[in-house]
Amino acid sequence: MTPAQSYPHLDVLFITPEIHPLNKTGGLGEVSAALPTALSELGMDVRILIPGYPQILNGLKNKQKIAEFAAQSSFPAATLLSARLPFGASGNVPLFIIDCPELYRRDGGPYTDPQGHNWPDNAIRFGLLSKIGAILASDASPLDWHPDVVHCNDWQSGLVPAYLHFHKGTKAASLMVIHNLAFQGVFSPETVSQLGLPQTSFHTEGVEYYGGMSFLKAGLYYCDHIVTVSPTYAREIQVAPLGFGMEGLLSLRHEHITGIVNGISDEWNPVNDPHLEQNYSMDDLSGKVINKAALQQQLGLTVDPDVPLFGAVSRLTYQKGYDLLLRIITQLIDIPGQLVILGSGETMLEQELMRMARNHPGKMAVRIGFDEKLAHLIEAGADCFLMPSRFEPCGLNQMYSQCYGTPPLVHGTGGLLDTVVDCTAESLADGTATGFVFHELTPEAFLGALERAVAAYRDKPVWDRLMRNGMVQDFSWRASATDYRKIYLSLLNQKR
């Protein structure tokens, strides 16, 4: 028996502007709750640094003051509090909260005012997050705890690697994680001096970005390593258009970029999902048929166990490929097939999808908005899940679908290509096939994949294999955390 591998102890400072469920606005909030917990369960000492918004301060008990920071540059004085997340396994992960009422105690969201406009002092608000993160990751820290790695997320903590670069003492290795490259934290050139950065940093080989200064570019330029949320997306962002203007820098740093697919929450599990009509597992798939009938009945479709039912839960946008879907709906219905869609987005696409549904009663249903229970029922009740996205950094629904025995049909981009194995004779034979992938972004290619899916659906042994192959995939956060640990250890070895 091989002894379990032992790893060096790792201290990690995880910096984020949001965390589920206290102040989540998007996917980063989910990651910030789940990944530190998974890292902690691998034996790392992880501490989360976050601004002290009202939702954070009001949602946490037993807060203790552990440090104070004097005013400097344009930053007001701030107090550092410690607490622990009050829910689930995440309660094992300590939180450091920056209490600075002048910057953070406001109505509205983390980034915008109650009217949805960006706070005008966001550069200072997130500059302070970065500055304190850098202090805690350096030998200037007032704490006894010193991280080996500082894990930065998106532009809001992008200045941490820059501050560390210009600090001459001992400091942690820095990791910059891109969740959304489109948001770049761009501000006026004057911001450089306001944030206490040297004027020499305002350069193409520094924080300068098309005449302004960019927090994200600062992070990407000065960090020790870059991670994004899938291997394919890591390659795609090195060229236009998916580089969003950063492709030159990213291609120069290609040897320092890694793609790690996000994990998914344990709540997406057909064995114990409370939203389903009937729970089921890989050992007993009979509940899937019951959920299909419940979905058909609830949405006014003809209840038929044999017709292939395609499902989608998404923002209804051009980026998500819904203009392509519109062009093949008639052929899908004529197969014959059924289609259910849940989501909201661009008005034109919403209206056209609703019109198509009215034209195909009993065969197509569209629900505008979001409904958690229905989203889970679609994953369980559909036979095949559609994701024709033009680009998709990671994607989650294609992973949910596989857990529910619902083979996904996807466009081969980003995380979709990394998490779905196209059904071919070879992939069926070696047991890796989990869905259907089309590569050309055309209605014809999409329809071709759809026809392949229908042919496989009608071959019950093949479809059964596809379902089961998907259900055994490991999309856990533990798998993602294990990949992050490899990066951390590599950075530590480079620092020595």
Swiss-Prot record:
Its EC number is 2.4.1.21. It catalyses: [(1->4)-alpha-D-glucosyl](n) + ADP-alpha-D-glucose = [(1->4)-alpha-D-glucosyl](n+1) + ADP + H(+). The keyword Metal-binding does not apply. One of its GO terms (molecular function) is alpha-1,4-glucan glucosyltransferase (UDP-glucose donor) activity. One of its GO terms (biological process) is glycogen biosynthetic process. ADP-alpha-D-glucose binds at residue 24. The keyword Glycosyltransferase applies. Keywords: Glycogen biosynthesis, Glycosyltransferase, Transferase. InterPro entries: Glyco_trans_1, GS/SS, Starch_synth_cat_dom. Pathway: Glycan biosynthesis; glycogen biosynthesis. Synthesizes alpha-1,4-glucan chains using ADP-glucose. This is Glycogen synthase.
